[in-house]
Amino acid sequence: SGYCGGTSMGYADLYWINNYNSSFGNEQELRTLISTFKEKGIGTIADVVINHRKNVSNWVDFPRETYKGETYEMVSTDICSDDDDGETKKWADKNGYSLSTNKDSGEGWGGMRDLDHNSENVQKCVKAYLDFLLNDLGYTGFRYDMVKGYKASFTAQYNSEAKPQFSVGECWDSSNTIKSWIEGTKTDDALQSAAFDFQFKYVVRNAVDKSDWTWLSKPNDDKGTGNNWPLVNTNLDQGKYRRYAVTFVENHDTEVRPDGSSNGPLKKDTLAANAFMLAMPGTPCVFMKHWQKYPTQIKAMVAARKAAGVNNESSYANFRSNKDYYAIVSKTNNENRLLAVIGNVAAIEQSVNTQQWVKVLEGYHYAYYLPTTMETAYADLSTGIHQGEQ
């Protein structure tokens, strides 16, 4: 994110193009980071905040920026008419400004100006911004923030023109709402974006909190009997949306923050939670703090996933499960590729056919097995058992 007018994580976006001296470094450092990753075969995803925007000095002014010889500047009429529940309009009327005649096309958000994406000028500015991110800074794709704040069709419009290699939207809601958002990004019969699988995160949280691993196979509700299934779960439209599911077990909003606030944090079994995620279909997103704390263990899980060929269109089947453990077999092209055990590994070992499976990885409350017939250079890390609550 560009300069936000002070110390900021980037959520209060102000500059989109001409000022990248942010809380995390300057523009050249950002360019070096992106290019270094690219040299290593790693794409960098930009956090794109276009639901709302901060102002320069009053309620309705925005920075003037230049890109490819053209000037871009939003004006007061690019702000939704019902921004801040009418408070912005009161200020504008009092100070001689006009807002858009259009109401917000999605949910409102207080504190900054909600942008009217029906405005041709807003669309022009957003498209220039996305082009700058991809073709000037060198980003690979986008993580769209708060996509419930504007119609999904605008994401479709922006992506179909920008053509990012990867796109994911933060639609923090039930799976039915997330499904509707994904479908809303369709252009020419092609879906334009993935979405974070929030119910996957909360199902893992439920299993950990209840010390009952069978909850990994249940929907996210108090009794585990409803329809709020994770996107990757077979019970949700036969797994139709797992290709568009970005799974995670923790993020910056759900974790316990320094001030003590949280939204369903993962309190223990961090490694087991990541092992489950990395054995499942979908596109897994490892929380940075988990990687920083357990780089060796998580790197081994990623290596096993890659060796097994598990991807975002793989399927899975229940192998064995009870309160103490949950075991699945992940499949690609209908072939058994990875057996993952979450929970009490010792309790299930006698049920694993060692003529078919070889254990390649084991830690506290998790183990991975690969088929004995699979030719792989994957190292046996089964001795790397990590003791203690995670």
Label the predicted regions:
Residues 108, 112, 116-119, 144, ...:
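Residues at structural and domain junctions
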Residues 117-129:
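Alpha-helical scaffold elements lining the catalytic groove of polysaccharide deacetylases
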Residues 23-24, 120-121, 264:
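Residue-level marker of alpha-helix boundaries and capping positions
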